């Protein structure tokens, strides 16, 4: 019986998920870095509460690119856009584009937001903390 070498899954066959860590402890549970070949999970996360936290971070980027309008529902187009962007990032920086995406999410995630509180018809804006799952979105 011959031993088969198990090849790790690389995104688009080029970029590895190994060695990438989330430095922000608040986002660590919500940024999924599960290895995958293509960012397409066929919507398996839709049937449970908070299951979108288990979706790969690259697929979440692709899903957010499909906003209502001209790009609505065109996932193949969004995947190709992300693939081309990752190739450009890889050529210009020489680093793993997945790691750059994770750092960008960490740096761009807001920590505070404001909410409206009304007392007797007067509206006050009050600072509140942002949930980690919303910070990733």
PLM ranges: what are they?
Residues 1-79, 83-137:
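Strongly charged
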């Amino acid at each position: 019986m011959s031993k088969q070498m198990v090849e790790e899954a690389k995104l688009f066959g080029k970029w590895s998920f190994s060695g990438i860590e989330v430095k922000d402890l608040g986002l660590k549970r919500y940024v999924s870095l599960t290895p995958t070949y293509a960012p397409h999970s066929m919507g398996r996360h839709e049937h449970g509460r908070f299951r979108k936290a288990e979706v790969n971070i690259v697929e979440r980027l692709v899903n957010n690119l499909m906003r209502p309008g001209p790009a609505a529902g065109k996932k193949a187009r969004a995947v190709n856009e992300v693939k081309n962007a990752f190739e450009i990032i890889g050529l210009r920086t020489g680093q793993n584009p997945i790691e750059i995406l994770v750092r960008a999410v960490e740096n761009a995630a807001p920590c505070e937001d404001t909410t409206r509180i009304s007392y007797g018809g007067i509206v006050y804006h009050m600072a509140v903390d942002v949930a980690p799952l919303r910070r990733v979105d």
